[in-house]
């Protein structure tokens, strides 16, 4: 067996198992950890297919930022498990219906790919980025992004800018009844105006 095919099946199996563990575990921290493992396996699949830029971006963005953020949020919230009275027998029809829909989608996609014709042939993956005049996928993505989709790219930048400003405005609460420290007035004060002697009279 080719090493690429072996790694493809290995990453696929681990990604499926990790996905099942994400939705099957009751501990939220463990679910987030398995979600990070899913992202790593998908990044390995993308690395096998050719676009290494997307693979590293998946690890940097999802694993390095979003998944770690989820993990810290879940750990700081200290989510407590609550016992529910839902019986699993009532969930069987929904589970069977979902399984049948997913299985039909799998077989329909398997039939459309027509993998029967590829029997006896060695399966390999075509790197379309390298086929395009021997350009790397980063150059291809940059060329397409800054030429054909330059307007959409600018719109995405404006949306992110508006979102950033909106978050700052929503989190900036100014209270009027709070006494603020004025450094300039404090430094301009002199000793005769500040120090005041009080004469205390003793009671007889």
Swiss-Prot record:
Q: What InterPro entries does this protein map onto?
A: NADH_UbQ/plastoQ_OxRdtase_su6 (IPR001457), Nuo/plastoQ_OxRdtase_6_NuoJ (IPR042106)
Superkingdom of the source species: Eukaryota
Q: Provide the reaction this enzyme catalyses.
A: a ubiquinone + NADH + 5 H(+)(in) = a ubiquinol + NAD(+) + 4 H(+)(out)
Protein topology in the membrane = Multi-pass membrane protein
The regions listed as transmembrane in this protein's record are 5-25, 29-49, 56-76, 91-111, 151-171
What is an example of a Pfam family matching this protein?
A: Oxidored_q3
Q: Where in the cell is it found?
A: Mitochondrion membrane
Tell me, in one coarse class, where this protein mainly resides. Answer: mitochondrion
List keywords of the entry alphabetically: Electron transport, Membrane, Mitochondrion, NAD, Respiratory chain, Translocase, Transmembrane, Transmembrane helix, Transport, Ubiquinone
Among its keywords, does the record have Transmembrane?
yes
Record carries keyword Amino-acid biosynthesis: no
Q: Which GO terms describe its cellular component?
A: mitochondrial membrane
UniProt-listed Enzyme Commission number(s): 7.1.1.2
Query: Which GO molecular function annotation, any one, does this entry have?
Result: NADH dehydrogenase (ubiquinone) activity
PANTHER family linked: NADH-UBIQUINONE OXIDOREDUCTASE CHAIN 6
Family as reported in the entry's similarity comment: Belongs to the complex I subunit 6 family.
Give the protein's function: Core subunit of the mitochondrial membrane respiratory chain NADH dehydrogenase (Complex I) that is believed to belong to the minimal assembly required for catalysis. Complex I functions in the transfer of electrons from NADH to the respiratory chain. The immediate electron acceptor for the enzyme is believed to be ubiquinone.
The protein, known as: NADH-ubiquinone oxidoreductase chain 6
């Amino acid at each position: 067996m080719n090493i690429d095919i072996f790694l493809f099946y290995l990453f696929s199996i681990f990604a499926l198992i990790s996905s099942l563990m994400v939705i099957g575990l009751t501990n939220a921290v463990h679910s987030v950890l398995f979600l990070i493992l899913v992202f790593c396996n998908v990044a390995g699949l993308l690395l096998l297919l050719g676009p290494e830029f997307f693979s590293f971006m998946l690890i940097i963005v999802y694993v390095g930022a979003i998944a770690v953020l989820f993990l810290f949020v879940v750990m700081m919230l200290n989510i407590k498990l609550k016992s529910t009275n839902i019986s699993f027998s009532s969930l069987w029809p929904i589970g069977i219906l979902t399984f049948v829909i997913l299985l039909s989608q799998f077989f329909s996609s398997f039939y459309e790919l027509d993998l029967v014709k590829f029997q006896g042939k060695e399966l390999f993956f075509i790197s379309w980025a390298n086929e395009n005049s021997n350009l790397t996928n980063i150059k291809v993505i940059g060329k397409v992004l800054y030429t054909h989709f330059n307007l959409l790219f600018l719109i995405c930048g404006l949306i992110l800018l508006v979102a950033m400003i909106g978050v700052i405005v929503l989190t900036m609460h100014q209270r009027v009844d709070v006494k603020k420290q004025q450094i300039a007035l404090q430094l301009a004060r002199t000793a005769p105006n500040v120090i005041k002697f009080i004469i205390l009279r003793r009671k007889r």
